Each structure stands twice: as structure tokens, then as C-alpha cells.
Amino acid sequence: MSDLTKQMIYDIYVRLLHLNEQKANTSLQQFFKEAAEEDVAEIPKNMTSIHVIDCIGQHEPINNAGIARKMNLSKANVTKISTKLIKEEFINSYQLTDNKKEVYFKLTRKGRRIFDLHEKLHKKKELAFYQFLDSFSQEEQKAVLKFLEQLTSTLEAEQTDGTPDKPVK
């Protein structure tokens, strides 16, 4: 691969990162709009809280450590978010009868509405993404998959060991 091609790939990668940041900023507004159309009055104020609700809805019963592991968040961050979600009545905490040490979470009716709306929006995005992928051949899709797997592994390794700029293998 030529240096020019590598530079073009890198430039597009940086552009993709910037677009992703911009998209993240508009996703919450889009969620608010959809919620209003569905008559969902109360909504968490950030996407991380919405994703915690989603994680709880997908994995009930789940505890703080489970949410932290599945979402790659610190336990302290999950505690802060879950405390707020309990106060806002999106989730409840409880203990299992056979385990009084662990605190588990489940969705309230209000939280279930957020979960359902979030699932609906994700399904729409997933379908659109699959339609986009259909424009590529099987071989191209395999190359994209390999690239994304290796890039994700590299970025995850950077986060866990703090080593920036590791080359992709």
C-alpha cells in the first residue's frame, strides 16, 4: 500500500472520528424528539444514562459491577449514574433473597419506556446500517470486519495499558 493511500485512510479515519463526535451531540436531541413523538415526558439528560437503562433492561437482574463491565465504565461512575436514575425513578434497586450483599437493578415502568424507545431507535439504525453494508461485496465486508476488529482491539489496548499509538497488527 502506498504512503498516499495510507494518508488518505488516516485522513478519512480522523474525519470519521470528528463526525462521530458531532453525531453523539445530535443523538440526544434526536432521542428527545422521538420521545416527544411517543409521549415520553421524562428522559435522562445524557446518553450514558440512557445506555445504562438499556444495559439494565437487557440484563436484568444486573448489579453495579456487571453494568461497569458490560459498558466499560468505572464502578464509581455506574454508582453515580444509578443513584441519579433511582432518584429520577427510572430504575429500582433491590437485593436477592439469597444474597443480601449485592444490590441489583431493574427498570421501573418509566425506565421501561426509555428502554423500549431506545431499542426502537437502535433497530432503525441497525437496519439502515445493514442496508449500507449490502452495497459491499462479501469480500469487501470481510475486509471491513477485519479492519474494524483490529482497530477496536488496538484502541481497547490503548485504553487499558495507556500505550498510545500502537501499530495495528
Swiss-Prot record:
Q: Calcium among the record's keywords?
A: no
Citing just one GO molecular function, the answer is: DNA-binding transcription factor activity
According to the entry, every stretch annotated as the HTH marR-type domain falls at 10-153
Task: Report the domain of life of the source organism.
Answer: Bacteria
Example GO BP: negative regulation of DNA-templated transcription
What is the consequence of disrupting this locus? Deletion of the gene induces changes of proteins involved in cellular processes depending on iron availability. In iron-rich medium, mutants overproduce a red pigment after entry into the stationary growth phase.
**Induction of the gene:** Up-regulated in response to iron starvation. Negatively autoregulated. Also repressed by CcpA in stationary growth phase.
List the InterPro entries hit by this protein, alphabetically: HTH_MarR-typ, Metal_resp_HTH_trans_reg, Tscrpt_reg_MarR-type_CS, WH-like_DNA-bd_sf, WH_DNA-bd_sf
Q: Which UniProt keywords apply?
A: Activator, DNA-binding, Repressor, Transcription, Transcription regulation
| Regions recorded as binding DNA | 64-87
- State the PANTHER family in the record: HTH-TYPE TRANSCRIPTIONAL REGULATOR PCHR
Task: Summarize subunit and interaction data from the UniProt record for this chain.
Answer: Homodimer.
| Role noted for this protein | Represses the expression of the yvmC-cypX operon, which is involved in pulcherriminic acid biosynthesis. Also negatively regulates yvmA, yvnB and its own expression. Positively regulates yisI expression. Acts by binding specifically to a 14-bp palindromic motif, the YvmB box, which is present in the promoter region of the target genes.
State what protein this is by name: HTH-type transcriptional regulator PchR
- Protein's organism: Bacillus subtilis (strain 168)
Lineage of producing organism: Bacteria, Bacillati, Bacillota, Bacilli, Bacillales
